[in-house]
């Protein structure tokens, strides 16, 4: 137990010592490189010469910035050199006598960016160079400067001159190992263990080693394609499956234990393939089990009656999986690596300078001239890798790709893209402008059509619609027009075109005036022969039509008169007796003559009964009769009209029926009024 305690105490002590040493080493170094010291006369600052010569050494004091440098404490550090030479001499990079050039002034704090520097040259009469061992007048020269200084690898050259001496030197500030940043305050130590896998960049940031990622490069990058949820890895390019999953990329579920011919979508399932059944899909149902057509361990699935599908194992193809595939056919090896097919995959044999599963990582350095097309190589991470700075028009990790700045088709509206070294330009089609031909230019904007022509902007130019009297591409040509084409003159006037003004002039005939001869002058009115002619013609036409109508009527009246008629004589005596009363008789047929026969009793016929024949209601001839005799008491002679005889045996004549010949063109109608003492005989067509 005591031994264990002592061992633990020892380790703790060693750790403290290491930490103290690390802190004492500081975070940076101020370096001063002496180059040349000139003391041609070999004298001291007091002007007294050195005997036999000035054996010169230097004391350097570095301190914080002061506007006026004082000889106080050297807060940033101090250093002395051995004797470097006599009088005038040049200082080598590493002087003899155990001195170091450049001189190192380490500091263990954040570099402030400003400083004050004192450089003293002393004469050493003996070998003891301690300040207390030297007389005060042994000083040869003293210079003091102050300024700002950034951390960097570049040296700043300076030269200080006094009355008797001249000193040329250079200086810089660099960070100590494992310190980075603008003020050497960032600590970074590369490592490749459980706590991280990285190197340090020039700014102190971590740069993960290939295959690692994360804030401190502790997370491995799994095999490409490894399922994010179903797989994991403990080292790069590895893919370990979680429970229930299998396969190279852990994307295949593990079916239920004992599942023979089934699949799964989640772990521990057993979904039978077609043609198999049972709890574990081990019962053969059809063609696949009976005939086993699939080769090389392929899975057979029934897809119908006597049909099947073979699911081949990796590395096989064909209908029955009878053909073997090589995984090297896809050329997985990069950078010229050769592929070797293996039973469970493939292996890439990488050429010199490359490594990795697919030879994707390069081990080249700038010494191998890896940059093409004039690219410059720059080493990174202390030569662990490199970066190529490509010239214009080239890109890629090794400047192997030529940049085509027209690939993105930047020119619009059909413009042509042209490469012009580090830039590009667009050649626009007519009608477009702009850096990328994005602006449409209207050819009509400048009003190119003359004399009031109308401009039409076309895709590849413009077109002018010219007004009357102008032609040409821009309506610039004046042309004469036929002003008389529209016949503007009236009343048979003669039209002339005025070529100077492109207008018309009307030469009017006698009797008309006006710009178009549209106004008549005061002349005696002429006889209206046209109206008279039309009236006379119309009258003649009406007369002819009347004559034609009369002729047609006469032709219709010339039928035979001996036709059979139904006369009043066909009536019975009683009917005759009551046919004609002693009232007025109206005969509407002017062609017929009325005769009343009173029969045997003539007494009534001798009476004055005023049987009057009234022809007023007869508009025209209605029929033709052949009955002889006249009515004795007629007020109007019937002339040559054919008689219509009416016979009656009684003194009263009562007419109650129609009597007329049925086959004649006219009908004699006996019209009986409401009063019995009135009898009307009429004809009706």
From Swiss-Prot:
It comes from the Eukaryota. GO terms for molecular function: calcium ion binding; Notch binding; receptor ligand activity. Residues 218-251, 252-282, 284-322, 324-360, 362-400, 402-438, 440-476, 480-518 form the EGF-like domain. The chain crosses the membrane at residues 530-550. Disulfide bonds join 50-54, 61-74, 175-184, 188-200, 208-217, 222-233, 226-239, 241-250, 253-264, 259-270, 272-281, 288-300, 294-310, 312-321, 328-339, 333-348, 350-359, 366-377, 371-388, 390-399, 406-417, 411-426, 428-437, 444-455, 449-464, 466-475, 484-495, 489-506, 508-517. The record marks 110, 216 as: Interaction with Notch1. Residues 173-217 form the DSL domain. Residues 1-26 form the signal peptide. Glycans are attached at residues 108, 183, 205, 393. It is found in: Cell membrane. Keywords: Angiogenesis, Cell membrane, Developmental protein, Differentiation, Disease variant, Disulfide bond, EGF-like domain, Glycoprotein, Membrane, Neurogenesis, Notch signaling pathway, Repeat, Sensory transduction, Signal, Transmembrane, Transmembrane helix, Vision. Residues 185-187, 191-195 are annotated as: Interaction with Notch1. PROSITE patterns: ASX_HYDROXYL, DSL, EGF_1, EGF_2, EGF_3. One of its GO terms (biological process) is negative regulation of cell population proliferation. Residues 27-529 are extracellular. PANTHER family: CRUMBS FAMILY MEMBER (PTHR24049). Involved in the Notch signaling pathway as Notch ligand. Activates NOTCH1 and NOTCH4. Involved in angiogenesis; negatively regulates endothelial cell proliferation and migration and angiogenic sprouting. Essential for retinal progenitor proliferation. Required for suppressing rod fates in late retinal progenitors as well as for proper generation of other retinal cell types. During spinal cord neurogenesis, inhibits V2a interneuron fate. Interacts with NOTCH4. Interacts (via N-terminal DSL and MNNL domains) with NOTCH1 (via EGF-like domains). This is Delta-like protein 4. The lineage of its organism: Eukaryota, Metazoa, Chordata, Craniata, Vertebrata.
């Amino acid at each position: 137990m005591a031994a264990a305690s002592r061992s633990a105490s020892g380790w703790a002590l060693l750790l403290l010592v290491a930490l103290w040493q690390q802190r004492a080493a500081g975070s940076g170094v101020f370096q001063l490189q002496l180059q040349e010291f000139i003391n041609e006369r070999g004298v001291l600052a007091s002007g007294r010469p050195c005997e036999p010569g000035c054996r010169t050494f230097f004391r350097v004091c570095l301190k914080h910035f002061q506007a006026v440098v004082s000889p106080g404490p050297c807060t940033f550090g101090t250093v002395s050199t051995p004797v470097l030479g006599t009088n005038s001499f040049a200082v080598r990079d590493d002087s003899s006598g155990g001195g170091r050039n450049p001189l190192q002034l380490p500091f263990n704090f954040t570099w402030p960016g400003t400083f004050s520097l004192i450089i003293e040259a002393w004469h050493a009469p003996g070998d003891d160079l301690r300040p207390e061992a030297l007389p005060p007048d042994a000083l040869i020269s003293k210079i003091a400067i102050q300024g700002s200084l950034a951390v960097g690898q570049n040296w700043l050259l300076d030269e200080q001159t006094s009355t008797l001496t001249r000193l040329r030197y250079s200086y810089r500030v660099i960070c100590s190992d494992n310190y980075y940043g603008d003020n050497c305050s960032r600590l970074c130590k590369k490592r490749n263990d459980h706590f991280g896998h990285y190197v340090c960049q020039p700014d102190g940031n971590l740069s993960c080693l290939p295959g690692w990622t994360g804030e401190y490069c502790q997370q491995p990058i799994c095999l490409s394609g490894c399922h994010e949820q179903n797989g994991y890895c403990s080292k790069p390019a590895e893919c370990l499956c979680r429970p229930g999953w299998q396969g190279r990329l852990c994307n295949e579920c593990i079916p239920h234990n004992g599942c023979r011919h089934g699949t799964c979508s989640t772990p521990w399932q057993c979904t039978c393939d077609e043609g198999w059944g049972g709890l574990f899909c081990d019962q053969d149902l059809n063609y696949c089990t009976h005939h086993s057509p699939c080769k090389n361990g392929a899975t057979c699935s029934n897809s119908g009656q006597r049909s099947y599908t073979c699911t081949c194992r990796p590395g096989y193809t064909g209908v029955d999986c009878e053909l073997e595939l090589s995984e090297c056919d896809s050329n997985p090896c990069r950078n010229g690596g050769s592929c070797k097919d293996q039973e469970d995959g493939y292996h890439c044999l990488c050429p010199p300078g490359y490594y990795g599963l697919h030879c994707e990582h390069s081990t080249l350095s700038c010494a191998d001239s890896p940059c093409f097309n004039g690219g410059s190589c720059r080493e990174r991470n202390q030569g662990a890798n490199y970066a190529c700075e490509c010239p214009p028009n080239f890109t890629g990790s090794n400047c192997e790709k030529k940049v085509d700045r027209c690939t993105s088709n930047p020119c619009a509206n059909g413009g042509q893209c042209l490469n012009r070294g580090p830039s590009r330009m667009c050649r626009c089609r007519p009608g477009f402008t702009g850096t990328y031909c994005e602006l449409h230019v209207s050819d009509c904007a400048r009003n190119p059509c003359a004399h009031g022509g109308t401009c039409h902007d076309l895709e590849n130019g413009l077109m002018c619609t010219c007004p009357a009297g102008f032609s040409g591409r821009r309506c610039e040509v004046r042309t004469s027009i036929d002003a008389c084409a529209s016949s503007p003159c009236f009343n048979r006037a003669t039209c002339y075109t005025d070529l100077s003004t492109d207008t018309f002039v009307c030469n009017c005939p006698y009797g008309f005036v006006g710009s178009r001869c549209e106004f008549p002058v005061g002349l005696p009115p002429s006889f209206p022969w046209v109206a008279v002619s039309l009236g006379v013609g119309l009258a003649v036409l009406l007369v002819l039509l009347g004559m034609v109508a009369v002729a047609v009527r006469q032709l219709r009246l010339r039928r035979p008169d001996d036709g059979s008629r139904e006369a009043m004589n066909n009536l019975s005596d009683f009917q005759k007796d009551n046919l004609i009363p002693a009232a007025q008789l109206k005969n509407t047929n002017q062609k017929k003559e009325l005769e009343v026969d009173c029969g045997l009793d003539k007494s009534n016929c001798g009476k004055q009964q005023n049987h009057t024949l009234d022809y007023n209601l007869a508009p025209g001839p209605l029929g033709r009769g052949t009955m002889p005799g006249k009515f004795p008491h007629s007020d109007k002679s019937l002339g040559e009209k054919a008689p219509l005889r009416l016979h009656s045996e009684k003194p009263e004549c009562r007419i109650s029926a129609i009597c007329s010949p049925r086959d004649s063109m006219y009908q004699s109608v006996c019209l009986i009024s409401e009063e019995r003492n009135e009898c009307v005989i009429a004809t009706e067509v």
